[in-house]
Amino acid sequence: MSSFTHFNDQGRAKMVDISDKKATVRTAIACSSIVVTKEIYDKISHNEIGKGDVLAVAQIAGIMAAKRTSDIIPMCHPLLLKGVDVSFDWKQSEEQYRLLIEVKVKTEGSTGVEMEALTAASATALTVYDMCKAVDKGMIIGETYLLEKTGGKSGDYTRNS
């Protein structure tokens, strides 16, 4: 079992020294979702939310969040990201509509981009909530999870279904 790396010899928080780690291409894919009513789905689909184009704004928020992850996650290294892609897909069941959010992040560096992908997925869902809460505050933000990561010393990872 791996040990926690963000503690020093005194058991206090530290930022891990990555200066000896090899720079490699690293990717991460994270997912989240938000469940909305048919009314919100229709308003998003027809661009009728008063604050603007919900998916465009949420997409930009996700990209911005990935770029600023080290500002809000204390032990996260600031990274030069090579790419961030936020995509959406709708799934319907009865009168509930689930907006699936997938974020792909890529870099070439000494540490992974899992936190950037997870932060971006979360911020994207939160932005949808913020933009639509005037219509219905009962939206439900779903699980946020790492789907896949590649590169680095720990190797590749793919979430089991």
UniProtKB/Swiss-Prot annotation:
CDD domains: MoaC_PE. Pathway: Cofactor biosynthesis; molybdopterin biosynthesis. The active site is at D130. Its EC number is 4.6.1.17. One of its GO terms (molecular function) is cyclic pyranopterin monophosphate synthase activity. GO terms for biological process: Mo-molybdopterin cofactor biosynthetic process. It comes from the Bacteria. Pfam families: MoaC. SUPFAM superfamilies: Molybdenum cofactor biosynthesis protein C, MoaC. InterPro entries: MoaC, MoaC_bact/euk, MoaC_sf, MoCo_biosynth_MoaA/MoaC, Mopterin_CF_biosynth-C_dom. Keywords: Lyase, Molybdenum cofactor biosynthesis. Substrate binds at M75, C76, H77, M115, E116. It catalyses: (8S)-3',8-cyclo-7,8-dihydroguanosine 5'-triphosphate = cyclic pyranopterin phosphate + diphosphate. PANTHER family: CYCLIC PYRANOPTERIN MONOPHOSPHATE SYNTHASE, MOLYBDOPTERIN COFACTOR SYNTHESIS PROTEIN A. Catalyzes the conversion of (8S)-3',8-cyclo-7,8-dihydroguanosine 5'-triphosphate to cyclic pyranopterin monophosphate (cPMP). Belongs to the MoaC family. Homohexamer; trimer of dimers. This is Cyclic pyranopterin monophosphate synthase. The gene is moaC.
